[in-house]
Amino acid sequence: MLLWSGICGLSPPRIFPSLLVVVALVGLLPVLRSHGLQPSPTASTIRGSEPPRERSIGDVTTAPPELAPESRPVNHSVTEHGMKARKAFPVLGIDYTHVRTPFEISLWILLACLMKIGFHVIPTISSIVPESCLLIVVGLLVGGLIKAVGETPPFLQSEVFFLFLLPPIILDAGYFLPLRQFTENLGTILIFAVVGTLWNAFFLGGLMYAVCLVGGEQINNIGLLDNLLFGSIISAVDPVAVLAVFEEIHINELLHILVFGESLLNDAVTVVLYHLFEEFANYDRVGIVDIVLGFLSFFVVSLGGVFVGVVYGVIAAFTSRFTSHIRVIEPLFVFLYSYMAYLSAELFHLSGIMALIASGVVMRPYVEANISHKSHTTIKYFLKMWSSVSETLIFIFLGVSTVAGSHHWNWTFVISTLLFCLIARVLGVLGLTWFINKFRIVKLTPKDQFIIAYGGLRGAIAFSLGHLLDKNHFPMCDLFLTAIITVIFFTVFVQGMTIRPLVDLLAVKKKQETKRSINEEIHTQFLDHLLTGIEDICGHYGHHHWKDKLNRFNKKYVKKCLIAGERSKEPQLIAFYHKMEMKQAIELVESGGMGKIPSAVSTVSMQNIHPKTLPTERILPALSKDKEEEIRKILRNNLQKTRQRLRSYNRHTLVADPYEEAWNQMLLRRQKARQLEQKINNHLTVPAHKLDSPTMSRARIGSDPLAYEPKADLPVITIDPASPQSPESVDLVNEELKGKVLGLSREPGRATEEEDDDEDHDGGLVMRTKEPSSPGTDDVFTPAPSDSPSSQRIQRCLSDPGPHPEPGEGEPFIPKGQ
């Protein structure tokens, strides 16, 4: 009654997960028995005097195995009549050993699924504690319950982990890998994965060897190679733990791909170091040849795994070309070829994780072009489901195996391992980031460095590698396993639970949940082509150049072999537009918005439909003239500052330009021309009305030169619209003043009136000229001795510079021949 009243007092959101846990634990009761359902000792004692009963298998009656054929009771009356004794047909029978293995597997998977449902039903728990932490706690509780009833808890075998639980998680990560972010940051990822892992392994192994020398009698017998082996196991960042934590905090794409990419690509380093130190530990003496071979094995393991993955990816893509009539089996090829790539790599002791990633990345674009939309949906959801279940089982069995395993605790060794792991991670990230930022355009800020260092989580890969150690060759493997479990629990619980509040506290940029529109995708591709052209012009071949080369090779050769039909010949931009338009149409139909579709013909339609012409409407409002002038001024002022060289750009790597000296001379001439133009602008008169900008004037004159015919009696500026930015495109035509306007016969008052009339009626840019000065004199007006006073006053008036123009208002007008 007390239990029932306690359950009734819970709120509905808390009752549901509690019932799920109870149902799962009740389902696990048969597993708690050692070998299925067996009678209790009391029952067997009571029935001890009775002979063993016969067990029926189907419709055949068999005698118990402990009775010999001679000791069977014989019914003489039945024998005489030639009849055999028969039992009644068994209506109900129990044979747990027959279904034990699949039944227990199903129960564990059911427990994992119920736990995931229960955690997300209570939002207060899932928002504070990561799912991986809760799953480990459930594993600890289940393992403790199994051990409390006197049974041995199941242990996470390394073969089960590496062959069945890990491949789905890596395949899901490799198949849906954000390829653009991965390739743009591949150099940074490789430095963190290779150099960072080597630093952690040797730094941790060397310091732990020093600790063992002064740590006491229990750990004095651990040698240098044993400590280096232990450092190689514990140094690698675990992809399962990183995925479980980073997907919940929704960190930005850059940090996510850096940490997750490091956890994927450090597998080759971990495998090589593990096998290398495991072999060296059995040698009496390690020579230079062994070290060189170990160094070469890194390239064999990593590049060999990539090669195996690429081969299986190409085969999978080629096979999907012929599945147009059998759509049902299309998803199966993706799973089988990927899994065979992993097994083939493990067969030759290559990196299976690298093989899975390479196969998923290579096959995806070609397979998705060949298979149907339903098959693509099946692949997506099956991979997500498979990887989620595997991840849940890994964390649950990690908790159960902690209870089931044998441990050897040493405070000095365990605490030193935990402390040195944190120090090595921080120092490695800081040092490598300082080096990487010298070559990156987008620098890694101190906040980014903190998240990268804090996100170096350890997980089940280190636990399984520690469990693989042979106790005969490594007597201290129990101590290693205890230290590994301590580091895993600290990183998952402490760092995993505190990383979300720290991200919010530091205001780290989060991932954008909204997808990019068609406009953004098209402009992104346009910018890629533009940057490729810029790299070709300056001779700096970056990743845009090689990406363009690879795309051209892919379009010219690979697509024709791996993609069926006309899809291989379709331009990428048009194919993407078709895909996005179809996606939007499907979403519109599913949302019930068909009544709002306009009656305009689609450009994708294959039918020749001629609808009624609809009145064209301007989507965006027209900009005002003031706003347009403001934008032009901003562009003119800022486009001059784009002549900057990146830090990764080195002019000494370019081919020597024979025209560089001529270019420098041209720049000097332009600088002198600008100085001359500043002097000329001082002699410009200001019209009465507001003038258009020089850019608008050039455009107007270039479009219709006859409509703006200048006056014949004034000096004008002739503009060549074909090349407005060339110094030779502007010519100053000085026409002689008709009838010697400035002569003595003209009166000063009349000259002033004519000048005012010219300023009122002129709509263009007018330049007044003065008499050329003699050589060796400056531009200051000096009257000649023969000039009359009226002529001197007129020329002094004309030489008045007037008000200066606003800075940055017009573009320079450079006279020809200066």
UniProtKB/Swiss-Prot annotation:
Signal sequence interval, chain numbering: none
Compartments, record wording: Cell membrane; Basolateral cell membrane
Sequence ranges on the Extracellular membrane side: 1-98, 149-158, 216-222, 284-287, 342-350, 405-410, 470-475
Region (PI(4,5)P2-binding region): 509-516, 552-560
One of the protein's GO biological processes: regulation of pH
Residues recorded with modification Phosphoserine: 599, 602, 605, 648, 693, 697, 703, 723, 726, 729, 788, 790, 799
Any Gene Ontology CC annotation: basolateral plasma membrane
Modification Phosphothreonine, positions: 603, 752, 782
Keywords: Antiport, Calmodulin-binding, Cell membrane, Glycoprotein, Ion transport, Lipoprotein, Membrane, Palmitate, Phosphoprotein, Sodium, Sodium transport, Transmembrane, Transmembrane helix, Transport, Ubl conjugation
Activity regulation, short description: Activated at acidic pHs. Inhibited by cariporide and eniporide. Inhibited by amiloride and 5-amino-substituted derivatives. Phosphatidylinositol 4,5-bisphosphate (PI(4,5)P2) and phosphatidylinositol 3,4,5-trisphosphate (PI(3,4,5)P3) bind and differentially regulate SLC9A1 activity.
TM ranges: 99-121, 131-148, 159-176, 187-215, 223-249, 253-283, 288-322, 329-341, 351-371, 374-404, 411-438, 445-469, 476-505
Segments of this protein annotated with the region Disordered: 39-76, 739-818
Side Cytoplasmic, residues: 122-130, 177-186, 250-252, 323-328, 372-373, 439-444, 506-818
UniProt PTM: Ubiquitinated, leading to its degradation by the proteasome. Ubiquitination is reduced by CHP1.
Chain residue ranges for the region called Interaction with PPP3CA: 684-687, 715-720
GO molecular function: calcium-dependent protein binding; calmodulin binding; potassium:proton antiporter activity; sodium:proton antiporter activity
Stretch list, region Confers pH-dependent PI(4,5)P2 binding: 540-545
Region annotated Interaction with CALM1, chain positions: 633-818
Reactions accelerated catalytically: Na(+)(in) + H(+)(out) = Na(+)(out) + H(+)(in); Li(+)(out) + H(+)(in) = Li(+)(in) + H(+)(out); Li(+)(in) + Na(+)(out) = Li(+)(out) + Na(+)(in)
Biased composition (Polar residues): 785-794
Its membrane topology: Multi-pass membrane protein
Region (Interaction with CHP2): 515-545
Family annotation (PANTHER family): SODIUM/HYDROGEN EXCHANGER (PTHR10110), SODIUM_HYDROGEN EXCHANGER 1 (PTHR10110:SF59)
Additional observations: Predicted models used for more than 20 years predicted 10-12 transmembrane segments. More recently, the structure of SLC9A1 has been solved and reveals that SLC9A1 possesses 13 transmembrane regions.
Subunit structure: Homodimer; dimerization is crucial for its function. Oligomer. Interacts with CALM in a calcium-dependent manner. Interacts with TESC. Interacts (via the juxtamembrane region of the cytoplasmic C-terminal domain) with CHP1; the interaction occurs at the plasma membrane in a calcium-dependent manner. Interacts with CHP2; the interaction occurs in a calcium-dependent manner. Interacts with EZR; regulates the cytoskeletal interactions of SLC9A1 and promotes stress fiber formation.
Name of this protein: Sodium/hydrogen exchanger 1
Gene source species: Sus scrofa (Pig)
